[in-house]
Curated annotation (Swiss-Prot):
Lineage, uppermost ranks: Bacteria, Pseudomonadati, Pseudomonadota, Gammaproteobacteria, Pseudomonadales
Family listed: Belongs to the diacylglycerol/lipid kinase family. YegS lipid kinase subfamily.
HAMAP family: YegS (MF_01377)
Free-text comment on the cofactor: Binds 1 Mg(2+) ion per subunit. Ca(2+) may be able to substitute.
Record's GO cellular component terms: cytoplasm
Binding site residues for ATP: 39, 65-71, 92
EC number: 2.7.1.-
Positions annotated to bind Mg(2+): 210, 213, 215
Name of the protein in its database record: Probable lipid kinase YegS-like
Domain DAGKc, residue spans: 1-129
Localization (cell): Cytoplasm
Family matches, as Gene3D superfamilies: 2.60.200.40, Probable inorganic polyphosphate/atp-NAD kinase, domain 1
Protein backbone atom coordinates (compact mmCIF):
# COMPACT_ATOMS: atom_id res chain seq x y z
CA UNK A 1 0.00 0.00 0.00
CA UNK A 2 1.29 3.45 -0.97
CA UNK A 3 0.47 5.75 1.98
CA UNK A 4 0.41 8.81 -0.31
CA UNK A 5 -2.15 7.44 -2.80
CA UNK A 6 -5.62 8.93 -2.33
CA UNK A 7 -8.75 8.27 -4.39
CA UNK A 8 -11.82 10.51 -4.37
CA UNK A 9 -15.03 8.56 -5.06
CA UNK A 10 -17.20 11.40 -6.38
CA UNK A 11 -20.97 11.27 -6.86
CA UNK A 12 -21.74 11.79 -10.54
CA UNK A 13 -23.94 14.84 -9.92
CA UNK A 14 -20.91 16.64 -8.48
CA UNK A 15 -18.60 16.00 -11.44
CA UNK A 16 -18.90 19.61 -12.61
CA UNK A 17 -18.58 21.20 -9.17
CA UNK A 18 -15.98 23.94 -9.60
CA UNK A 19 -15.23 24.18 -5.88
CA UNK A 20 -14.40 20.47 -5.85
CA UNK A 21 -12.19 20.84 -8.91
CA UNK A 22 -10.31 23.71 -7.28
CA UNK A 23 -9.89 21.81 -4.01
CA UNK A 24 -8.55 18.74 -5.82
CA UNK A 25 -6.16 20.90 -7.83
CA UNK A 26 -4.88 22.56 -4.64
CA UNK A 27 -4.18 19.17 -3.06
CA UNK A 28 -2.28 18.06 -6.15
CA UNK A 29 -0.26 21.27 -6.24
CA UNK A 30 0.67 20.63 -2.61
CA UNK A 31 2.17 17.31 -3.68
CA UNK A 32 -0.61 14.86 -2.87
CA UNK A 33 -1.29 12.03 -5.33
CA UNK A 34 -5.07 12.42 -5.57
CA UNK A 35 -7.07 10.58 -8.24
CA UNK A 36 -10.80 10.96 -8.93
CA UNK A 37 -13.39 8.37 -9.98
CA UNK A 38 -17.01 9.33 -10.64
CA UNK A 39 -20.04 7.18 -9.84
CA UNK A 40 -22.85 6.83 -12.35
CA UNK A 41 -25.26 4.20 -11.02
CA UNK A 42 -26.00 2.04 -7.98
CA UNK A 43 -23.12 -0.23 -7.10
CA UNK A 44 -20.44 1.98 -8.65
CA UNK A 45 -19.11 3.22 -5.31
CA UNK A 46 -18.66 -0.32 -3.98
CA UNK A 47 -16.94 -1.47 -7.16
CA UNK A 48 -14.64 1.57 -7.25
CA UNK A 49 -13.63 1.03 -3.62
CA UNK A 50 -12.87 -2.63 -4.24
CA UNK A 51 -10.71 -1.75 -7.26
CA UNK A 52 -8.94 1.00 -5.30
CA UNK A 53 -8.07 -1.36 -2.45
CA UNK A 54 -6.69 -3.89 -4.92
CA UNK A 55 -4.60 -1.11 -6.49
CA UNK A 56 -3.06 -0.17 -3.15
CA UNK A 57 -4.75 3.14 -2.37
CA UNK A 58 -4.17 4.15 1.25
CA UNK A 59 -7.12 6.55 1.62
CA UNK A 60 -10.56 6.76 0.03
CA UNK A 61 -12.53 10.02 0.05
CA UNK A 62 -16.34 9.78 -0.07
CA UNK A 63 -17.51 12.78 -2.10
CA UNK A 64 -21.29 13.08 -1.96
CA UNK A 65 -24.16 12.90 0.50
CA UNK A 66 -24.93 10.53 3.35
CA UNK A 67 -25.86 7.73 0.94
CA UNK A 68 -22.54 7.92 -0.89
CA UNK A 69 -20.74 8.02 2.46
CA UNK A 70 -22.54 4.87 3.65
CA UNK A 71 -21.72 3.00 0.42
CA UNK A 72 -18.03 3.89 0.52
CA UNK A 73 -17.71 3.23 4.25
CA UNK A 74 -19.40 -0.17 3.99
CA UNK A 75 -17.27 -1.27 1.04
CA UNK A 76 -14.13 -0.07 2.79
CA UNK A 77 -15.00 -1.88 6.03
CA UNK A 78 -15.82 -5.10 4.22
CA UNK A 79 -12.47 -4.88 2.43
CA UNK A 80 -10.82 -5.45 5.84
CA UNK A 81 -7.68 -3.59 4.84
CA UNK A 82 -5.72 -0.74 6.40
CA UNK A 83 -7.04 2.00 4.09
CA UNK A 84 -8.64 5.01 5.78
CA UNK A 85 -11.71 7.11 4.93
CA UNK A 86 -11.99 10.88 4.46
CA UNK A 87 -15.26 12.73 3.90
CA UNK A 88 -16.09 15.43 1.35
CA UNK A 89 -19.71 16.40 2.20
CA UNK A 90 -21.62 17.36 -0.94
CA UNK A 91 -25.18 16.22 -0.20
CA UNK A 92 -28.34 17.95 0.98
CA UNK A 93 -28.31 16.90 4.62
CA UNK A 94 -24.69 15.84 5.29
CA UNK A 95 -25.88 14.70 8.70
CA UNK A 96 -22.82 12.71 9.72
CA UNK A 97 -20.39 15.38 8.52
CA UNK A 98 -22.21 18.19 10.31
CA UNK A 99 -22.35 16.29 13.60
CA UNK A 100 -18.66 15.38 13.29
CA UNK A 101 -17.62 18.99 12.67
CA UNK A 102 -16.35 18.30 9.15
CA UNK A 103 -16.25 21.52 7.08
CA UNK A 104 -18.74 21.78 4.22
CA UNK A 105 -16.29 23.74 2.06
CA UNK A 106 -14.43 21.29 -0.24
CA UNK A 107 -10.96 22.74 0.32
CA UNK A 108 -11.31 22.66 4.11
CA UNK A 109 -12.80 19.16 4.05
CA UNK A 110 -9.92 17.78 1.97
CA UNK A 111 -7.46 19.46 4.34
CA UNK A 112 -8.52 16.86 6.92
CA UNK A 113 -6.43 14.35 4.96
CA UNK A 114 -3.57 15.75 7.05
CA UNK A 115 -5.29 14.66 10.27
CA UNK A 116 -4.40 11.26 11.72
CA UNK A 117 -7.16 8.76 10.95
CA UNK A 118 -9.06 7.59 14.05
CA UNK A 119 -10.68 4.16 14.48
CA UNK A 120 -14.46 4.47 14.75
CA UNK A 121 -17.34 2.04 15.18
CA UNK A 122 -19.90 0.97 12.62
CA UNK A 123 -23.45 -0.14 13.27
CA UNK A 124 -24.78 -3.37 11.83
CA UNK A 125 -28.30 -4.69 11.39
CA UNK A 126 -29.21 -8.01 9.80
CA UNK A 127 -25.92 -8.13 7.91
CA UNK A 128 -26.00 -4.51 6.68
CA UNK A 129 -23.55 -1.88 7.92
CA UNK A 130 -24.30 1.77 8.64
CA UNK A 131 -22.04 4.63 9.62
CA UNK A 132 -24.45 7.21 10.98
CA UNK A 133 -27.92 6.14 12.07
CA UNK A 134 -30.84 3.80 11.58
CA UNK A 135 -34.18 5.60 11.79
CA UNK A 136 -37.68 4.19 12.01
CA UNK A 137 -41.22 5.45 12.25
CA UNK A 138 -42.58 8.49 10.45
CA UNK A 139 -39.18 10.21 10.19
CA UNK A 140 -37.72 7.41 8.09
CA UNK A 141 -40.66 7.64 5.69
CA UNK A 142 -40.06 11.38 5.28
CA UNK A 143 -36.38 10.80 4.47
CA UNK A 144 -37.18 8.03 2.00
CA UNK A 145 -39.91 10.01 0.22
CA UNK A 146 -38.22 13.40 -0.10
CA UNK A 147 -37.54 13.90 -3.81
CA UNK A 148 -34.12 14.76 -5.21
CA UNK A 149 -35.61 17.73 -7.10
CA UNK A 150 -37.12 19.15 -3.91
CA UNK A 151 -33.82 18.72 -2.05
CA UNK A 152 -32.04 20.52 -4.88
CA UNK A 153 -34.37 23.52 -4.60
CA UNK A 154 -34.90 23.72 -0.84
CA UNK A 155 -31.90 21.96 0.66
CA UNK A 156 -32.49 20.58 4.15
CA UNK A 157 -35.88 22.34 4.36
CA UNK A 158 -37.16 19.79 1.83
CA UNK A 159 -37.41 17.18 4.59
CA UNK A 160 -39.58 19.52 6.66
CA UNK A 161 -41.87 20.34 3.73
CA UNK A 162 -42.26 16.67 2.83
CA UNK A 163 -43.14 15.85 6.42
CA UNK A 164 -45.72 18.62 6.60
CA UNK A 165 -47.44 17.43 3.41
CA UNK A 166 -47.65 13.83 4.67
CA UNK A 167 -49.38 14.46 8.01
CA UNK A 168 -52.44 12.57 6.79
CA UNK A 169 -50.31 9.41 6.66
CA UNK A 170 -49.12 9.66 10.26
CA UNK A 171 -49.60 6.48 12.24
CA UNK A 172 -47.67 4.98 15.10
CA UNK A 173 -45.46 1.93 14.85
CA UNK A 174 -45.54 -0.85 17.42
CA UNK A 175 -42.43 -2.57 18.69
CA UNK A 176 -40.67 -4.47 21.45
CA UNK A 177 -37.10 -3.42 22.26
CA UNK A 178 -34.66 -5.64 24.15
CA UNK A 179 -31.03 -4.95 25.12
CA UNK A 180 -28.77 -5.46 28.15
CA UNK A 181 -30.48 -3.69 31.08
CA UNK A 182 -33.08 -2.17 28.76
CA UNK A 183 -36.60 -3.27 27.85
CA UNK A 184 -39.35 -1.19 26.27
CA UNK A 185 -42.56 -2.06 24.44
CA UNK A 186 -45.25 0.13 22.97
CA UNK A 187 -46.30 2.46 20.18
CA UNK A 188 -43.80 5.00 18.94
CA UNK A 189 -43.73 7.85 16.47
CA UNK A 190 -40.00 8.06 15.78
CA UNK A 191 -36.94 5.92 16.39
CA UNK A 192 -33.21 6.58 16.12
CA UNK A 193 -30.48 4.01 16.66
CA UNK A 194 -27.34 6.05 16.36
CA UNK A 195 -23.67 5.61 15.88
CA UNK A 196 -23.83 9.30 14.94
CA UNK A 197 -26.14 11.98 16.30
CA UNK A 198 -28.50 13.33 13.65
CA UNK A 199 -30.49 12.26 10.60
CA UNK A 200 -33.15 13.47 8.18
CA UNK A 201 -31.62 16.87 7.50
CA UNK A 202 -30.52 17.95 10.96
CA UNK A 203 -32.83 16.21 13.44
CA UNK A 204 -30.64 15.42 16.46
CA UNK A 205 -32.15 12.16 17.66
CA UNK A 206 -29.12 10.87 19.60
CA UNK A 207 -27.48 13.97 21.10
CA UNK A 208 -24.87 12.13 23.21
CA UNK A 209 -23.72 9.58 20.63
CA UNK A 210 -20.02 8.89 20.10
CA UNK A 211 -18.52 6.93 17.23
CA UNK A 212 -15.73 5.38 19.29
CA UNK A 213 -17.49 4.17 22.46
CA UNK A 214 -18.55 0.68 21.33
CA UNK A 215 -22.21 1.53 21.95
CA UNK A 216 -25.35 2.42 20.03
CA UNK A 217 -27.52 5.27 21.27
CA UNK A 218 -31.23 4.41 21.22
CA UNK A 219 -33.88 7.15 21.12
CA UNK A 220 -37.57 6.25 21.05
CA UNK A 221 -40.34 8.83 20.83
CA UNK A 222 -43.45 7.14 22.29
CA UNK A 223 -46.73 8.07 20.67
CA UNK A 224 -47.99 11.23 22.43
CA UNK A 225 -51.61 12.26 22.83
CA UNK A 226 -51.10 15.20 20.47
CA UNK A 227 -49.43 13.13 17.76
CA UNK A 228 -49.63 15.60 14.87
CA UNK A 229 -48.58 18.57 17.00
CA UNK A 230 -45.61 16.69 18.42
CA UNK A 231 -44.55 15.56 14.97
CA UNK A 232 -44.72 19.13 13.70
CA UNK A 233 -42.48 20.24 16.55
CA UNK A 234 -40.05 17.40 15.84
CA UNK A 235 -39.84 18.18 12.12
CA UNK A 236 -39.44 21.87 12.86
CA UNK A 237 -36.34 21.36 14.97
CA UNK A 238 -37.36 19.29 17.94
CA UNK A 239 -37.45 21.99 20.64
CA UNK A 240 -39.88 20.98 23.35
CA UNK A 241 -39.99 17.22 22.73
CA UNK A 242 -36.67 16.27 24.35
CA UNK A 243 -38.32 15.16 27.60
CA UNK A 244 -40.62 12.77 25.74
CA UNK A 245 -37.84 10.50 24.43
CA UNK A 246 -36.94 7.14 25.93
CA UNK A 247 -33.15 6.76 25.67
CA UNK A 248 -30.54 4.06 26.24
CA UNK A 249 -26.93 3.28 25.31
CA UNK A 250 -26.39 -0.37 24.46
CA UNK A 251 -23.92 -2.72 22.74
CA UNK A 252 -26.75 -4.43 20.89
CA UNK A 253 -30.51 -4.14 20.48
CA UNK A 254 -33.23 -6.48 19.26
CA UNK A 255 -36.44 -5.02 17.84
CA UNK A 256 -39.56 -7.07 17.21
CA UNK A 257 -42.48 -5.60 15.27
CA UNK A 258 -45.38 -7.93 14.49
CA UNK A 259 -46.55 -5.75 11.59
CA UNK A 260 -43.03 -5.12 10.32
CA UNK A 261 -40.86 -2.05 10.75
CA UNK A 262 -39.53 0.22 8.01
CA UNK A 263 -36.00 1.38 8.80
CA UNK A 264 -33.74 3.80 6.94
CA UNK A 265 -29.98 3.13 7.12
CA UNK A 266 -28.25 6.34 6.05
CA UNK A 267 -30.60 6.48 3.05
CA UNK A 268 -30.98 2.75 2.39
CA UNK A 269 -34.40 1.25 3.21
CA UNK A 270 -34.75 -1.96 5.20
CA UNK A 271 -37.88 -3.72 6.42
CA UNK A 272 -38.30 -6.57 8.86
CA UNK A 273 -40.32 -8.03 11.70
CA UNK A 274 -37.25 -8.89 13.75
CA UNK A 275 -34.11 -6.75 13.58
CA UNK A 276 -30.90 -7.13 15.55
CA UNK A 277 -28.63 -4.10 15.81
CA UNK A 278 -25.05 -4.39 17.00
CA UNK A 279 -21.74 -2.51 16.98
CA UNK A 280 -18.52 -3.34 15.15
CA UNK A 281 -15.98 -1.48 17.34
CA UNK A 282 -13.10 0.25 15.58
CA UNK A 283 -14.21 -1.13 12.22
CA UNK A 284 -13.04 1.84 10.15
CA UNK A 285 -10.32 4.50 10.34
CA UNK A 286 -11.64 7.98 9.51
CA UNK A 287 -9.99 11.40 9.17
CA UNK A 288 -12.00 13.60 11.56
CA UNK A 289 -11.29 17.11 12.89
CA UNK A 290 -9.28 17.39 16.08
CA UNK A 291 -11.79 17.72 18.91
CA UNK A 292 -14.70 16.33 16.87
CA UNK A 293 -17.86 16.16 19.05
CA UNK A 294 -18.31 12.54 17.98
CA UNK A 295 -15.03 11.40 19.57
CA UNK A 296 -14.61 10.52 23.23
CA UNK A 297 -11.00 11.60 23.69
CA UNK A 298 -7.97 12.99 21.84
CA UNK A 299 -5.79 10.56 19.89
CA UNK A 300 -2.95 8.94 21.80
CA UNK A 301 0.51 10.31 21.13
CA UNK A 302 2.78 7.76 19.45
Amino acid sequence: MDKDKVLLVLHGKQAGNEEVRAAVAAQREAGRELAVRVTWEDGDARRIVEEALAAGYATLVAGGGDGTLREVAEALARGRGEASLAILPLGTANDFARAAGIPLEPAAALALLDQTARPIDLGEVNGKLFLNMATGGFGSKVTANTSEDLKKVLGGAAYLLTGLTRFSEVHAAQGRFSAPDFQWEGEFLALGIGNGRQAGGGHVLCPQARVDDGLLDVSILPTPQDMVGTLGTLLGGGNGVESLFVRARVPWLEVEAAEGLDVNLDGEPLEGRKLRFSVSPGALRVHLPAGSPLLREPPRED
